[in-house]
């Protein structure tokens, strides 16, 4: 759990830029920033979710596209903060997908789609978007948007970004709304 004290210290560190000197984001041949700790996957979401859950973590999917300035900001500012990186790595596996990509992904329900078709199926239209999926085994039976427990719908400043990950990691969505959670965090 991200304690109030840890959160305040993290917020101060983020505001001062502490930890921003480390950089694990690399620019790939296809124009993406990628963290060296992102999930390497065969793009089979049900299998990824199972292995992630077995490790005691949750699956997050980040949708990006080449040239996206807010995707760049997410990597070079948010993921670059040591406190955020550590928290996310401890609680999540992050799979990076291309909004306009053509790699074949097997969805939770077994449907095989190109990345761009999968994005459309989940209502992903812009970038960056981070989807957080339930760690329950019943995802194949649910409608696509009901599989998510939360979503970051675009760029968020570092403190709010970290709080979204904490909201999901603590399963606070089971006890109330994000708004209530944020109010309690101060």
PLM features: what roles do these ranges have?
Residues 55-68:
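Short active-site neighborhood of thiol/selenol oxidoreductases, capturing the structured segment around
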Residues 115-131:
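Structural micro-motif
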Residues 1-14:
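N-terminal secretory signal peptides and thylakoid transit peptides that target proteins
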Residues 72-87:
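Typically the conserved alpha-helix immediately C-terminal to a functionally engaged Cys/Sec
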Residues 134-173:
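Non-catalytic, surface beta->alpha helical segment in thiol-disulfide oxidoreductase systems
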Residues 88-113:
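Thiol-based oxidoreductase modules, predominantly thioredoxin-like and allied folds used
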Residues 24-37:
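N-proximal helix/coil linker or "cap" segments that precede and/or mark the start of modular domains
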Residues 41-58:
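A short beta-strand-turn-helix
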């Amino acid at each position: 759990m991200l304690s109030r004290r840890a959160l305040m210290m993290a917020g101060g560190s983020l505001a001062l830029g502490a930890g921003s000197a480390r950089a694990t984001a690399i620019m790939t041949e296809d124009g993406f920033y990628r963290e060296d700790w992102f999930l390497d996957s065969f793009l089979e979401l049900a299998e990824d979710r199972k292995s992630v859950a077995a490790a005691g973590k949750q699956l997050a999917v980040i949708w990006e596209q080449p040239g996206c300035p807010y995707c760049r900001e997410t990597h070079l500012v948010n993921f670059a903060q040591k406190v955020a990186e550590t928290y996310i790595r401890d609680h999540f596996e992050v799979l990076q997908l291309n909004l306009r990509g053509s790699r074949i992904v097997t969805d939770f329900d077994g449907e095989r789609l190109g990345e761009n078709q999968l994005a459309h199926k989940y209502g992903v239209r812009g970038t960056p978007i981070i989807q957080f999926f339930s760690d329950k085994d019943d995802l194949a039976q649910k409608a696509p948007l009901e599989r998510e427990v939360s979503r970051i719908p675009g760029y968020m400043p570092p403190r709010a970004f970290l709080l979204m990950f904490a909201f999901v990691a603590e399963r606070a969505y089971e006890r109330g709304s994000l708004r209530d959670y944020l109010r309690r965090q101060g």
